[in-house]
Structures are given as structure tokens and as C-alpha cells.
Amino acid sequence: MKQQILDILVELEKWRAERKLSTESQREGYIRNVMEELGELAEAIKTNSEHEYIDALCDIVVFAGNCVNKEKFDEAFIPWETMEESFVNLHEDTLLKSMFANASEMTHSPNISIASLYSFCKDLAAKKGYDFFKCMKEVLKQINSRTGAWNEDLKKWVKDTSPKAKSKEYQADFDKCKLN
């Protein structure tokens, strides 16, 4: 799991660099942005939409990962490795509550929280039959294909939703991320 998270953090670091964003700028709007994604997750649960559910989990990890300095991640990960296995058999409701609590801790200790948040999301995706790392790679392809601009009021990168931009945007294909 550690290498998967590091791979994601490297991709997010490239994404931020291309857009001249910093982890600090990402932390400023984190709570509002992740709350929006949690709302999308709740809607996906309500409507039983698997793809929207997976997309919301991935977006939560994207927002969280954009708050993390990958150089400091290594030292924070060591204590988490010993606890990860104990979460695999938790009920989905417990995982969701734990993920929500952990997502709100990102602003205080992002380098530790990303490991637990990723683990919760990975387990939630697995319960729906998806390989979360493959899903994350699909979402990273999608966000890398987007154009847009930083919105200072929202404290986030806002994608261009024009028809031209939408026609060029890669769409994450979660069907190829199913567990065997």
C-alpha cells in the first residue's frame, strides 16, 4: 500500500507543479472541498450508483493527497503499517464513519492521515468489487486531461466545463478496475 500511495503522491505533485499550486494552497480549501465530495458520496450511496461512489472516494483521496508533502510521508507511514490489516473486516458503515473522521483530520496531520484515509477508501472500494489503486490511476488520468483555472474564492482548481474542454477530457473507466 505504501508504494501505491507514493505513486499517487508523485502524480499529484506533478499535477500541482504544472498548475503552479502548492500543498499549502490545497490545504486552505480542503475542508470545504472534501465536504463537497462527501456529499457526492452520500448521493451515490442514496442512489446506489457504484461509479459515482468510487469516483467520490477517489476525489477525496485526490484532495487529501494534494495536501501532503511526499518527502515527509515516509516517516509518518511507519506506525500506520502495523494497524492497516485490522480495518479490512470492518462493516461498511464503520469504514465510512472512520473515513469521514479521518478526512477531517487531514488539516492537522496530513502526512499520517493520508495512509489511513487511503486504506479506508481502498477497503470501501473493495467491498464494492473495485481495485482502488486502479481506480485512482483512472481518476489521475482524467484530472490530468482537464483544463481549467485556480479559483481563489473556492480554493480549488476548477475544471473548464465548456463543450470543447469536455470533448477532450478523458473519462475514468472504472469497469476495467473491477477485482478479479
What are these model-predicted stretches?
Residues M1-N180:
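Flexible "arm" and connector segments at domain edges
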